[in-house]
Structure formats: C-alpha cells, structure tokens
Amino acid sequence: MRTIFVNEREAVRAWHLIDAAGRPLGRVAARVACLLRGKHKASYTPNQEMGDYVVVINAEKVFLSGTKPKDKMYYRHSGYPGGLKSVSFSALVKRRPVEPLRHAVKGMLPKGPLGRKLIKNVKIYAGSVHPHESQNPVPLSC
C-alpha cells in the first residue's frame, strides 16, 4: 500500500475561533500553533502548509500566573551598542494587547519560510469583535 500525500492546493482548510479570555497564555498559544501546523489532521505533513486558519479573540484578557505579569520581560535589540530594549508583560499588554500572544505562537512555529507563512494564518484581536464572520469560524475551547 502506498502512502498518500495531500498537496497544499488539495488541503481542506477550516476556520477556528478561540476565545482567549481567562486562559493561560501558553495553553492558548500551544493550541493555536497545533492548529496552524495541521497536526490535528491525519494528512499532516511537516514540510507543507496543511494547517487551518485561526481567529483568536479577547487576546488582551489572557493571563499569566503568579508574579509573571510583572517579572516576564520581552527583549529586542536595535543593532546599535547599548540598544537592548526591554518591556514587561503587563506594560506590553497595555501598549499592544495582541503582541504577547503573537510572540508566543510565533515561538512555537518552525523557524524559516514555513513558519513565516504559517504565522500569517492566525488573526489575533484584542476585543471580541472580528471581521471574519463570513468565514463561519468554528468555536473551540482550549
């Protein structure tokens, strides 16, 4: 019996809706990354874009346990000497509410061209309103 490989053009893609309100950041990000990769499908192929589209709402209401909201730091570097910038989770959520979740999901995806394609398939919104109603996303729990 031969192994059947599904082509990227033949892959059936669904839309999923995840409400992140009151859920841990890592659990939501892990579920989103799994759906983006397509690991929940029998036709999973690690080198192809086989995953589904994911819409995440209420990203600003995601939480971290303990003292992590003030202790967890996000770093970036300008490329110049002394150009290391850091911001805490709580400060980042106030300024850019979707960024911590996007950053966590991106870290769970493959690095390289496939990961850059996959991160475009997730749509993250701070509130509960999103413009993807016409795609009829299926609500999921994490």
Swiss-Prot record:
<protein>
    <recommendedName>
        <fullName>Large ribosomal subunit protein uL13</fullName>
    </recommendedName>
</protein>
<dbReference type="GO" id="GO:0006412">
    <property type="term" value="P:translation"/>
</dbReference>
<dbReference type="InterPro" id="IPR005822">
    <property type="entry name" value="Ribosomal_uL13"/>
</dbReference>
<dbReference type="GO" id="GO:0017148">
    <property type="term" value="P:negative regulation of translation"/>
</dbReference>
<comment type="function">
    <text>This protein is one of the early assembly proteins of the 50S ribosomal subunit, although it is not seen to bind rRNA by itself. It is important during the early stages of 50S assembly.</text>
</comment>
<dbReference type="GO" id="GO:0003729">
    <property type="term" value="F:mRNA binding"/>
</dbReference>
<dbReference type="Pfam" id="PF00572">
    <property type="entry name" value="Ribosomal_L13"/>
</dbReference>
<dbReference type="GO" id="GO:0003735">
    <property type="term" value="F:structural constituent of ribosome"/>
</dbReference>
<keyword id="KW-0687">Ribonucleoprotein</keyword>
<dbReference type="GO" id="GO:0005840">
    <property type="term" value="C:ribosome"/>
</dbReference>
<comment type="similarity">
    <text>Belongs to the universal ribosomal protein uL13 family.</text>
</comment>
<keyword id="KW-0689">Ribosomal protein</keyword>
<dbReference type="InterPro" id="IPR036899">
    <property type="entry name" value="Ribosomal_uL13_sf"/>
</dbReference>
<dbReference type="InterPro" id="IPR005823">
    <property type="entry name" value="Ribosomal_uL13_bac-type"/>
</dbReference>
<comment type="subunit">
    <text>Part of the 50S ribosomal subunit.</text>
</comment>
<dbReference type="GO" id="GO:1990904">
    <property type="term" value="C:ribonucleoprotein complex"/>
</dbReference>
<dbReference type="InterPro" id="IPR023563">
    <property type="entry name" value="Ribosomal_uL13_CS"/>
</dbReference>
